Amino acid sequence: MNFDHEELMLMMLYNTGTRLGLIHELRLMQCYLMPDETALRELSEGVIEKLKLLTDAEFAELELPPD
């Protein structure tokens, strides 16, 4: 799975060390977005969709440092 620079930065900010934990944190973050923060909502939705397609083993290979 290919992630662009913005996606990787978002993932590093919210990384908990697990794929499902990261998805959960991104969903929580979305709850606090203002209606005009559409770019961040779209970015996080795209990351979540890509993360859903990864296995836990593939996620572990991304080498994202946990928060």
Residue ranges and their predicted role:
Residues 27, 31, 36-67:
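Low-complexity intrinsically disordered segments
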Residues 1-25:
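N-terminal acidic leader/helix
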